[in-house]
Amino acid sequence: MLNPTVSEMPHFEEDGPAQPAPYVTIVLPCFNEQEHVVKEVERICAAMDASNRTYELLAVDDASTDDTLALLREAEPLFPHLRVISFGHNGGAGTVRRIGTQRARGQIVVWTDADMTYPNERIPELVDLLAANPDIDQVVGARTQESGTHRLLRVPMKWLIRKLAERLTNTRIPDLNSGLRAFRREVSLPYLRLLPPGFSCVTTITLAFLSNQHLIHYVPIDYAKRSGTSKFHFVRDAYRYLLQVLRMVMYFNPLKVLMPLALWLLGIGTAKFVFDQVREPLYIPNNTIMLLTSGLIVAAMALLADLIVRSRDGA
């Protein structure tokens, strides 16, 4: 597992004498959320206090340029289960979640956002589902509506990416990149090194679990309008989501991506070869040779990539 570099290592105060490990760790990334971060902390702590679960709330300030960190430090003495971690420079949502999960002391890790969009009062419900069903390794809050920015562009693009992910994993995925989820920390540890620094980290953890036959359960949730300014950039982040879906499936099952392409090229090349021979026997045009050669090369790459994956998993 990769370790964080010195420049991205978080800073936090020592907790004093060792305390019993909680059952749940909630990782809350915070970046320029001064208007509502304390309200979010209050809402999460109130919900968890009302449950029968021991917990810690890990609020990670990702080098905010406003008063987010100062407000968290002020709130820390008021909430006994709150731990505040600060980054020296902005590492991204994926870096926050990765390091937060690595530093978590709970058996169950919860990811959510601090922008008031997710119903964090339902976190105990997600935890209870995991606790009651040992066969389930992750519970995801599946949003029933899209309330984010660039809605006209985001909805069709996310639908296409989600359908591609479903096709490549042979699994129905109601919400590919929901930010509210609970999972077993021990199961997630081998996949944390795969998390990218940006928003596509949630897509990555979903595909990592599905590609390795870890059962994911989806719970319908409401999704509120975001408080404050969105950090989502449509073109850049949509491209990263699509690239990450392909990268993750290539990492775990490259035959799913490469072999269909190889078969298409070989099929078209073969049909073109037959057509060429009927039209002019013993003549093979350059484009026919290119199609057949490309198909063979891609097929060889697919088999080699699959061999590498099997060798890696067996090591």
Model-derived features: positions:
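Hydrophobic helical membrane-anchoring modules
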Residues: 2-23, 200-315
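Short, well-formed alpha-helical segments that are part of the catalytic scaffolds
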Residues: 10-12, 33-48
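Hydrophobic targeting segments
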Residues: 22-28, 37, 44, 55-60
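Acidic helix N-cap motif at the loop->helix transition within catalytic regions
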Residues: 35-39, 66-75
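Short beta-strand/loop segment that forms part of the nucleotide-sugar
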Residues: 53-63, 85-86
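A conserved acidic beta->alpha catalytic loop
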Residues: 61-70, 116
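Acceptor/aglycone-binding surface of glycosyltransferases and processive sugar-polymer synthases
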Residues: 85-103, 108, 120-199, 203, ...
